[in-house]
Amino acid sequence: MRTYDIIKNKRDGRKLSQPEIASIVKGFVDGSLPDYQMAAFLMAVYFRGMDEEETYWLTDCMRTSGDLISLDGIDGFTVDKHSTGGVGDKTSLVLGPVLAALGLKVAKMSGRGLGHTGGTIDKLEAIKGFSCELDTRQFIDAVNKIGVVIVGQTGNLVPADKKIYALRDVTATVDSIPLIAASIMSKKLAVANKGLVLDVKVGSGAFMKNLDDARELARLMVKIGTQAGRKVTAVLSNMDEPLGEMIGNAVEVIEAVDTLRNRGPESFTSLIKTLAAEALAMGAGLSRSEAEKKVGEVLADGRAYGKFLEMVKFQGGDVAMIEDYSRLPAAKKKDSLKSDRDGYISKIDCEEIGLAAMMLGAGRETKDSVIDMGVGLKLVKHVGDKISKGDVLAELYLNPGRDNSRAINRLREAIKLSDSKVVAQKLILDIVS
């Protein structure tokens, strides 16, 4: 069938066949299908959608467009965690070592940040010498010896997604649930982990702004993964304010390590326990209450922290930086944002907080931007807190040579106060399995 006819059928709301979807994906990857036809196809999908079967076929065609990573050389239950992206999200730095300390195998490939969301690889590279590029033998060895490894994605992993996402980004077709699900799951299923825990963020700092859309995305991704023979669970978590207190790179490493040493923010630790419980239910058959108890034990007795140190050492990082935070990159100047009135914090625009951190140099405005590892923010107050005039709302870690006024103004506008008390939303909104 001609590409024109496939586009027309989807435009008219008809269901596509597996060969038709395969033809579109293959043609776009090999260059025989031009951008303008792929853009038309994506817009047709955006408006007409795809059913579960079509979305699974699209995911599978994208998954097989490049390298597939076998984990046959790893002994034990391999599990991955994927977050749909948020602000202050250093979860992988803590969850991986926690699960490794409890006997699971975490073979994780992570990405870099862009825009208001940070990237796991960027945070780890705040540690001097830390290498996110391991060959296959080193990757397998790390998981077998330590139980956890975090590396960057290989160059030829799901090339279809790289090309399709770049086109979606400039054709206003990013926020399509079938296309989001296929993008995420094609990358996750290209690596042969036995289990996958999805952290689907919901709120102002997430791609999914409301719970209904997030739940629809979660259900679709769980079905795709299950159909592919994997164990998959999705946790829907609140991203109406940043996760934890720190936003940046080195500052988030510090908060992650503090959490591994059992002195992190309570809300962040509770998310770690929830995600870990889902992974342990898959891989160790534990109930949620049993799993959360065991997570508390490995945080309290230092086993999870020990796994993080082992991972850093294996991947070439300077362990002394973890043992002594003063060795990590640090900003030269500290400033604070103070309240100009009494009241209660009613709302924190999480996306704006992320953009403010990016403007300080903690993130990328473009894919070629250079990150300043030492700068960042600390949110001192949270939704529901009572505020007096002059109270510090946030701390800023700045370096000279950059106009920080835009970031400071953005931060000020992001934190809203009201005269009456507001009750903060719970962190865990739902679990889909």
Task: Describe the residue ranges of each PLM region.
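Acidic, glycine/proline-rich low-complexity segments that act as flexible tails and inter-domain linkers
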Residues: 1-88, 309-318, 430-433
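Well-ordered secondary-structure scaffolds
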Residues: 5, 10, 15-18, 28, ...
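Alpha-helix C-terminal capping segments
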Residues: 47, 93-105, 187-192, 227-228, ...
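Self-splicing inteins and homing endonuclease
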Residues: 60-83, 136-166
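Glycine/serine-rich anion-binding loops at beta->alpha junctions
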Residues: 77-100, 104-116
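Short beta-strand segments
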Residues: 109, 143, 151-153, 199-203, ...
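A glycine-rich helix N-cap at a beta->alpha junction
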Residues: 123-149, 219-225, 229
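Phosphate/diphosphate-binding glycine-rich loops and adjacent basic-rich segments that engage nucleotide
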Residues: 145-193
